[in-house]
């Protein structure tokens, strides 16, 4: 094989490190604020306020509902007024990660890539209702032709492409001048974890030297909330929002939908070293599988989750004895938490009892496509600072969930390496493994 700058030695094992990250979440609009709140066990769940949730079975969420802050982010990045909230917070988190890594000069290159997990944004009931109202004919009748015509007029004015899933990746590539590969991944709750995994692989195989990877999601809207309610996976603890998300607790009754964004700058370790940029942690392994079971349910035997964790360990050339912390998918649904616990015990065997396991979703809800990125960033911070954030609202133990879930209070601990689990509708499973930097 003839070596070129686009095809390095195929036998080489390039190390991949994190040099910057940033987050926008309901408990902190940048990484430091989020981390301080997470370690303190702050909940971002409250009654939905940016639309009237009356009549919905679930009326609570961990939403990004500070309109003034969203507009501040929009102005900072000179984004169009028609760009959806998910794009705005995604660009904000990406800009923060790039600034933290000092990576802007090296992103404007064909040796850089952008990898995004998001589902885009759709028209909600208010949009459709307004379109129907505006398209009325004499006597108040709404025809298909009239509705379609009004929809087309409004979509054109709004620039409909801005709601497409691939728009955020394209927007980021344009914003930073990235001319290498771009990818948008839609695998439900594993989207941004898989995006980061593919960025890691692209660096490992030499396709790029640096990548901007993560995800964003802002879908707390009437239709989305109702759809998740119809699946029977949402908590209905409307009277006590702050304690509704309670992963691994015996009283758990479903997840709380959240909103947010998380981005990380990944780069080849030698590339970061040449730039003189210190690494925060190393991304050392990645595993991905599919249950091939049911679109709406995970396999009860946890085979996909088990396979993803084992693949990540094998990819990193580590064993169960080398892992100290697990950032669990931990949705607070009866089935997920039980299956994930059993899967961890299967993979780690006797080592499982000493693991620290916690769920970020207990504080910020389930941010769907953005969850994997936010939770990997949390895992990186845990490795950096040698502390495991808590699973809040854990009060009543479940006999089938019997690991150390870091209940309610952060735990300082030696964390040499950690994994972040993401499992999604459709049977998608992704596991990312990070470890501390060898000094």
Where are these regions (language model features)?
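Glycine-/small-residue-rich "gating" segment that lines the acyl/pantetheine channel
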Residues: 137-155, 197, 201, 218-273, ...
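Condensing-enzyme catalytic core mediating Claisen C-C bond formation in acyl metabolism
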Residues: 15-19, 46-47, 239-316, 325, ...
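Flexible, low-complexity linker/loop segments at domain and module junctions
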Residues: 1-18, 106-109, 316-322, 353, ...
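ACP-dependent fatty acid/polyketide chain-elongation machinery
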Residues: 1-80, 101, 118, 270-282, ...
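Acyl-CoA/ACP chain-elongation machinery
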Residues: 207-253, 286-300, 330-337, 354-404
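Conserved small-residue
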Residues: 18-20, 38, 94, 114, ...
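Active-site-proximal alpha-helical scaffold in enzymes
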Residues: 90-103, 165-176, 182-217, 256-277, ...
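Conserved beta-ketoacyl condensing-enzyme motif
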Residues: 18, 42-186, 216-225, 320-336
């Amino acid at each position: 094989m003839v070596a070129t700058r686009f095809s390095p030695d195929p036998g080489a094992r390039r190390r991949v490190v994190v040099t910057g990250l940033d987050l926008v979440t309901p408990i902190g609009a940048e990484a430091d604020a989020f981390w301080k709140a997470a370690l303190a066990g702050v909940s971002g769940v409250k009654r939905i306020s940016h639309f009237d949730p009356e009549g919905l079975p679930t009326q609570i969420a961990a939403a990004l509902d500070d309109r003034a802050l969203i507009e501040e982010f929009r102005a900072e990045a000179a984004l169009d007024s028609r760009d959806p909230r998910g794009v705005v917070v995604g660009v904000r988190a990406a800009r923060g990660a790039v600034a933290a890594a000092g990576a802007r000069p090296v992103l404007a290159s064909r040796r850089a890539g952008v990898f995004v997990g998001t589902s885009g944004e759709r028209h909600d009931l208010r949009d459709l209702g307004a379109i129907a109202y505006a398209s009325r004919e004499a006597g108040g009748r709404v025809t298909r032709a009239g509705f379609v015509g009004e929809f087309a007029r409004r979509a054109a004015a709004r620039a409909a492409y801005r709601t497409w899933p691939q728009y955020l990746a394209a927007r980021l590539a344009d914003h930073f001048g990235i001319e290498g590969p771009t990818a948008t991944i839609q695998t439900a709750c594993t989207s941004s974890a898989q995006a980061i995994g593919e960025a890691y692989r692209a660096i490992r195989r030499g396709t790029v030297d640096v990548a901007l990877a993560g995800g964003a999601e802002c879908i707390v809207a009437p239709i989305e909330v109702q759809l998740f309610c119809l699946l029977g996976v949402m908590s209905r603890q409307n009277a006590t929002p702050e304690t509704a998300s309670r992963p691994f607790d015996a009283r758990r009754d479903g997840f709380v939908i959240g909103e947010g964004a998380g981005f990380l700058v990944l780069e080849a370790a030698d590339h970061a070293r040449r730039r003189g940029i210190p690494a925060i942690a190393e991304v050392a392994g990645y595993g991905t599988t599919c249950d091939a079971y049911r679109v709406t349910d995970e396999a009860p035997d946890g085979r996909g989750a088990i396979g993803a964790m084992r693949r990540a360990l094998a990819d990193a050339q580590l064993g169960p004895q080398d892992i100290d912390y697990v950032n669990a998918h931990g949705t607070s649904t009866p089935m997920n938490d039980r299956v994930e616990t059993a899967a961890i015990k299967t993979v780690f065997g006797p080592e499982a009892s000493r693991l620290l396991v916690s769920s970020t979703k207990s504080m910020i809800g389930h941010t769907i496509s953005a969850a994997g990125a936010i939770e990997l960033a949390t895992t990186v911070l845990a490795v950096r600072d040698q502390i495991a954030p808590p699973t809040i609202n854990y009060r009543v133990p479940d006999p089938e969930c019997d690991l150390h879930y870091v209940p309610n209070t952060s735990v300082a601990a030696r964390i040499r390496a950690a994994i972040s689990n993401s499992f999604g509708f459709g049977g998608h499973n992704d596991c990312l493994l990070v470890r501390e930097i060898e000094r």
